[in-house]
Regions:
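Conserved PLP-binding catalytic core of the aspartate aminotransferase-like
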Residues: 329, 341-373
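Short, Lys/Arg-enriched N-terminal segments with co-localized hydrophobic residues
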Residues: 12-25
Length: 410
């Protein structure tokens, strides 16, 4: 094409018009919008030809009772789709409270007998969780955004661990909250004393994931209790228990003694409900009321009817998800033994994923080699963990295939 051809001039004209439109739109944006750094989720391939071990989803499907019950409910009551849903998800909250009372908040340690579950002795809550102590929302991400809005002030700097759920700094930026980042200890655990010291100095509340993501390390309930005892009782203390069902110790029993404790949980991991977008809070009724006020100021009907029905049925069949969680924990332990025996470094996990490193191959290359063989894992291009990949625990068949691939990575 000649450098002065009409076609080239036309393309240049179109490009300039496009840039002008972008510039005009940018001039409309607030300074808040210009400074946003959005969360980057794991790959979600549209063709679904990959085995997905990159987003910490449950490899097992929802229980049969959920699928059958959903069809029956909609067939018998089609108006549930034509009318607005219950804005407070009351039946779902009752089901969540009942499930927590029956399981203690750790499915993988429950006893299962004839479709009934009971908590291990160490996981018994010791008091009754009531529906008034539950808040439900569109996934724990929306729930967390409301928590940030309600309890973390831009006047106070928020303390975050160096490696944590990457949506926390995103929300901090969204709400104009400065952050202090505390490096992990040499064993990848949280530097509790440093976190508490900075939080006290900054006059802020606290938030952290337990078990932690992406490291998989879990703090004991006793250690969390000690943190609460040293924290300001007038500041919110948020524990994100997204992965607790796979072997952590739930902090739900601590709610009786600490009125500033707020626990966030999700249906996306242990309850095979990532596609539902259903998360919830367990806390004292006054805190629940405050988060509800935020919800009602933004979206009075956050949970659709199908999600409410599905969540309720899932809770009523906790026995099934407890069995799935036990299988995932068993595969995790088997995978960690494989890593030890084949020269891979890993951080011992209490979640449904493991953070692993090959001593002689970069994290990016490990990710690429595994992907070339039809499996997706997660690589973080982040200083400190860029040599690692995070691998979700799948079914035995999926993990056996992964092991064969990893044996060849030298």
């Amino acid at each position: 094409m000649h450098k002065n051809s009409p076609e080239k001039k036309y393309r240049l004209k179109i490009l300039l018009l496009h840039l002008k439109k972008i510039t005009k739109i940018m001039s409309m944006l607030t300074s808040r919008m210009k400074n946003l750094h959005p969360y980057i989720p794991g790959e979600q391939p549209k063709d679904r030809v990959y085995i997905k071990l990159n987003a910490n989803e449950n490899p097992y499907p929802p229980c049969k009772e959920l699928l059958d019950g959903l069809k029956k409910e909609i067939s018998n009551f089609p108006s549930k789709l034509s009318l607005y849903p219950d804005p407070d998800s009351n039946e779902l909250k009752k089901a969540i409270a009942k499930m927590l009372n029956e399981t203690g908040g750790v499915l993988s340690r429950c006893s299962v007998s004839q479709k009934n579950v009971s908590p291990s002795e160490s996981d018994k809550i010791g008091f009754e969780i009531t529906p008034e102590m539950i808040y439900t929302g569109n996934g724990s991400d929306e729930v967390l955004s409301f928590v940030f809005y309600a309890f973390f002030d831009s006047k106070n700097t928020l303390v975050l661990p160096e490696f944590t759920y990457s949506f926390y700094p995103v929300y901090a930026g969204f709400y104009g909250i400065e952050t202090d980042i505390v490096p992990m200890k040499n064993d990848w655990s949280l530097d509790i004393e440093k976190i508490l010291s900075l939080a006290k100095k900054n006059g802020s509340g606290l938030i952290f994931a337990n078990p932690n993501a992406p490291t998989g390390i879990s703090l004991s309930r006793l250690n969390v209790r000690k943190m609460l005892e040293k924290s300001d009782p007038d500041k919110i203390f948020v524990v994100d228990e997204a992965y607790c069902d796979f072997g952590g110790e739930s902090c739900i029993p601590l709610l009786k003694d600490f009125k500033n404790l707020l626990i966030v949980r999700t249906f996306s991991k242990s309850l095979s409900g990532a596609g539902l977008r259903l998360g919830y809070i367990v806390s004292n009724p006054e805190i629940i009321s405050s988060v509800t006020t935020v919800k009602n100021s933004l979206n009075h009907f956050p949970l659709d009817a199908l999600t409410q029905i599905s969540g309720k049925i899932a809770c009523e069949n906790a026995w099934y998800y407890a069995e799935c969680a036990k299988k995932i924990v068993s595969e995790r332990e088997s995978f960690q033994k494989f890593l030890e025996g084949n020269g891979w470094f890993y951080i011992p996990s209490k979640t449904n994923f493991v953070l692993v490193k090959n001593p002689s191959v970069s994290g990016k290359e490990v990710y690429t080699k595994i992907k070339e063989n039809g499996i997706l894992v997660r690589h973080f291009d982040t200083n400190g963990i860029s040599d690692y990949v995070r691998i979700t625990i799948g079914t035995k068949e999926q993990m056996d295939k992964l092991k064969e691939i990893m044996k060849k990575i030298k």
